[in-house]
Curated annotation (Swiss-Prot):
<feature type="active site" description="Proton donor">
    <location>
        <position position="3"/>
    </location>
</feature>
<dbReference type="InterPro" id="IPR012319">
    <property type="entry name" value="FPG_cat"/>
</dbReference>
<protein>
    <recommendedName>
        <fullName>Formamidopyrimidine-DNA glycosylase</fullName>
        <ecNumber>3.2.2.23</ecNumber>
        <ecNumber>4.2.99.18</ecNumber>
    </recommendedName>
</protein>
<dbReference type="InterPro" id="IPR000214">
    <property type="entry name" value="Znf_DNA_glyclase/AP_lyase"/>
</dbReference>
<dbReference type="InterPro" id="IPR010979">
    <property type="entry name" value="Ribosomal_uS13-like_H2TH"/>
</dbReference>
<keyword id="KW-0234">DNA repair</keyword>
<keyword id="KW-0227">DNA damage</keyword>
<keyword id="KW-0456">Lyase</keyword>
<comment type="function">
    <text>Involved in base excision repair of DNA damaged by oxidation or by mutagenic agents. Acts as a DNA glycosylase that recognizes and removes damaged bases. Has a preference for oxidized purines, such as 7,8-dihydro-8-oxoguanine (8-oxoG). Has AP (apurinic/apyrimidinic) lyase activity and introduces nicks in the DNA strand. Cleaves the DNA backbone by beta-delta elimination to generate a single-strand break at the site of the removed base with both 3'- and 5'-phosphates.</text>
</comment>
<comment type="similarity">
    <text>Belongs to the FPG family.</text>
</comment>
<dbReference type="GO" id="GO:0034039">
    <property type="term" value="F:8-oxo-7,8-dihydroguanine DNA N-glycosylase activity"/>
</dbReference>
<dbReference type="InterPro" id="IPR010663">
    <property type="entry name" value="Znf_FPG/IleRS"/>
</dbReference>
<dbReference type="Pfam" id="PF06827">
    <property type="entry name" value="zf-FPG_IleRS"/>
</dbReference>
<keyword id="KW-0862">Zinc</keyword>
<feature type="binding site">
    <location>
        <position position="91"/>
    </location>
    <ligand>
        <name>DNA</name>
    </ligand>
</feature>
<keyword id="KW-0863">Zinc-finger</keyword>
<dbReference type="Pfam" id="PF01149">
    <property type="entry name" value="Fapy_DNA_glyco"/>
</dbReference>
Length: 270
């Protein structure tokens, strides 16, 4: 599933080609995504100029002069730029055609993504209760410490809770916990403030590094420019269960937390 770095990579790839451009038409070949694409999307968006492309958590917000297209890539979706008129392959469900001669093409084999329209996106029900962005000053170790008090749940699903902080998905939670030396099974409420300060720093570092390297391509993610991400080459623990820890050589262990697979080093993480 595309996580925050992959979505931010997509935003950075498509924004220069969209911002300031006018939409000539919207071609929808399949409306049945996680939520149906609005029947009147073409009417609402065509003729409008795209003002700004933003990201909120794992949602892309394509802001027009009036209204905003909210897009989510789901489990395996992607957005990329193609030339208008390029024949669509299977699973290529939407083209937003621009007067420049380019089109933003949405591909989603599993159809778990979304394309919705809103006049007030930040108050949309999907975005309204989201926590702070992890790479801003609104997120820090003190927030983690305060929100974790009294919680018996494991720390990994705690930091993956979008009400606590957005965009810390399975890959990056696993890597940040390793970097901070924290066992992902440890109760969130039993971790000290000092360790949370360290964890917040590592969450920011890991996410920033992944964005810089274009995200993590583990299966089928490609960025808005059609290129894969390269952060998978720097993964220390994610997907490496049973292999030797790159730091100490101990065999990495697999565990399931919050219905998600996780990997950790029993020696480096306490």
């Amino acid at each position: 599933m595309p996580e925050l770095p992959e979505v931010e990579t997509t935003r950075r790839g498509i924004a220069p080609h969209l911002e300031g451009q006018r939409v000539s038409r919207v071609v929808v070949r399949e409306r049945r995504l996680r939520w149906p694409i609005p029947e009147d999307l073409d009417v609402r968006l065509s003729g409008q100029r795209i003002v700004l492309v933003e990201r909120r958590a794992k949602y892309l917000l394509i802001n027009a002069e009036v209204g905003t297209l909210i897009s989510h890539l789901g489990m395996s979706g992607n957005l990329r730029l193609v030339e208008v008129g390029l024949p669509a392959a299977k699973h290529e469900h939407v083209d937003i055609e621009l007067e420049s001669g380019m089109a933003l093409r949405y591909t989603d084999p599993r159809r778990f993504g979304a394309m919705l329209w809103s006049q007030d996106p930040h108050n949309h029900e999907l975005l309204l209760r989201l926590g702070p962005e992890p790479l801003t000053e609104l997120f820090d170790g003190d927030r983690l410490f305060q929100l974790s008090r009294g919680k018996s749940m494991a720390v990994k699903p705690f930091i993956m809770d979008n009400a606590v902080v957005v965009g810390v998905g399975n890959i990056y939670a696993t890597e940040a916990l390793f970097a901070a030396g924290i066992d992902p099974r440890r109760a969130a409420g039993g971790i000290s403030r000092g360790r949370y300060l360290k964890l917040a720093i590592e969450i920011k570092r890991v996410l920033a590094a992944a964005i810089e390297r274009g995200g993590t391509t583990l299966r089928d993610f490609i960025g808005g420019d059609g290129q894969p991400g390269y952060f998978q080459q720097e993964l220390f623990v994610y997907g490496r269960g049973g292999e030797a820890c790159k730091v100490c050589g101990t065999e990495l262990r697999n565990v399931v937390l919050g219905q998600r697979a996780s990997v950790f080093c029993p020696r480096c993480q306490r």
